[in-house]
């Protein structure tokens, strides 16, 4: 008896504990939403989950119980049960009935609970359906507004699945009850089914046929989302064979179900067998066989003529899905010759060419500005600021706290003392010290500003590395930063976090984070607050799980000296007709939201950056208190929004094919582009400050070049504008197709083939240095192109500090390598004075440059001599011209 009680207690505890844990997480999540001010988001989501769960669960339970009620009321003379293929024994009717009823209720309850959980997972589809808007664009085949596909179809498909499952599960339950109670008897020659059972099953089969018919109807809509044709979406065979068949099946299936039900009702088994055979035959012929024959014998020989309307559909809707239809295409004649005057007139562009690559700069920042081992630079972000009155492109990296690198890891250190990172490192993208190191506008701890950028609130409590909770305003002083004379402490003064001073909250958070220390610590007082969801990516996802967030959050210094994170967010769908999907199935995407997180107090704000997006319109109706218009964003933050490079890369991958709007050109891939690669890695979009052709001033842009498919010359360059009032406008500048415009890979090959550069690289490698070749940047100036690539030197070991030692510049047929960008431009164009603030080469550097020129002259002379001996007088003459150019540069 005691043993049984102990087992019962264990079972009860095993059931209750997960429920209590979920309840604690639920309540502490509610406290998080109270802290952030988004309780309406929490309650709306909760109501949708509970409502959808109850709807599906209760509906299934009621349907099952009604059918079980009829099955339990039926009277049968006896209950026969067939066991082990031969033995048949009988049980009394009342004993079978007593067994069937509770088991049926239990099974229905279990199925209802599963339906509740499944239904709760459909909360987003429910909210989209109940708040849908009309888009105003119809699909070209069925004429439905695309809002039907985006907002209605997902829920309708879920309802169809639920209805089919409910009927099938109920049929199985009812069949089991009838079997136990004797309505179905298994004999050696088959099954004997009572007339009452047949009639009941006939009704269920008739209902099930309606769900199958609904499935065929929805499958017809789904053809526009399929990839069964040559081009994404419904093609000729889909529209003229499969769609017609599905329409026939939508009507035929209920009729077949009615005939099948009638056959069961009357016991006419032959009549009952014919309808499903007919439906299967129509499906096999109309969906599989006939379309395949149509494709092979009619479509394939005349594919372009027959598929042209459907190619137009996929072009149109793919461009709509990825916002490509707003890209403006502009011819770009790159045959104009640049002069020294052109370079001087584009001084702001030249001064903002990004020489510092992210990876070398991150390593350099880590070694120069990490200060202590427990600080870490996770990433380097690109932005632009008005620095001392000049529009300047900068690199910024937050100095976050790395708990993995704390010298002494214990609960008090990790949760009460070391609570935050401190400050930023901030400098221009193009300026280099004499030692080949970056210059700084803001550096050190406490922050030292060498420009008019001030950081007055440097503490970073919320960041990309802040993955654990901390407790602030405790009796233990928080560590702020180290100095030569000792550590400086601080006390949190922000509004972030949840009060944890009460015994109840201590107990709740101790349970949530599975540590008794929160409950027992004497350092936690009445004013203490617990900060959780501190990872900014996790924080925004907790509030808006229906959005996708960019993987590259970036930090901004506000005018008041505070630090803010800006995270790009995307609305998306996989339900846009005819739009080609990505690998994950998404075929509609917009960068419609900018999320801002305060690094000090964790406050969250979501701004709508694309009010024309239909998805964000619906989410705005669902969560009216979540979003604010872009006009509400403070000016000091709005001037730092930028077009996300990950989104432009995605758009570029699609635009490479879908810039072709002529179906014939698209079909033949006559003008297919691709993103150029250097090595195995495709080029990524990069930010730069430059003056667009025809514009009067420089602006902050995101740029990416294209090459023709399987060729290396340039075809176009794509740029997204980041500054107001032109934010979000994308331009595609196309090069003439009748002449060669060097592409990145061709320039890279010319660099590798340059004898002087290759010899210098070999020499550095032989001396134990690692040569790191930076990103190849294509810089449009006026109507010409400059190619710029920085070279970094670092010691071959892992601790090597990357130093920017050379800059390669290519223009036209010339490729030069110099210590600075200024010197490289002077070699090509001559006569340009270095702008104020740029680093001038020292006499030693000039001497080294002269020595390099001398070595280059000797190399050219040796090649000329060899060509003379071989009798190659044309090659000999070319080498003499090169030698003459080098001697002129030496004479400057």
Curated annotation (Swiss-Prot):
Pfam families, per database record: UPF0182
GO cellular component: extracellular region; plasma membrane
Main location: membrane
Keyword rRNA processing part of the UniProt annotation: no
Localization terms from the record: Cell membrane
Keywords: Cell membrane, Membrane, Transmembrane, Transmembrane helix
Topology versus the membrane: Multi-pass membrane protein
Top-level taxon: Bacteria
UniProt cross-references to InterPro entries, sorted A to Z: UPF0182
Transmembrane segments: 6-26, 50-70, 103-123, 158-178, 201-221, 248-268, 271-291
Family, similarity comment: Belongs to the UPF0182 family.
HAMAP family for the chain: UPF0182
Protein name: UPF0182 protein Gura_0902
Species of origin: Geotalea uraniireducens (strain Rf4) (Geobacter uraniireducens)
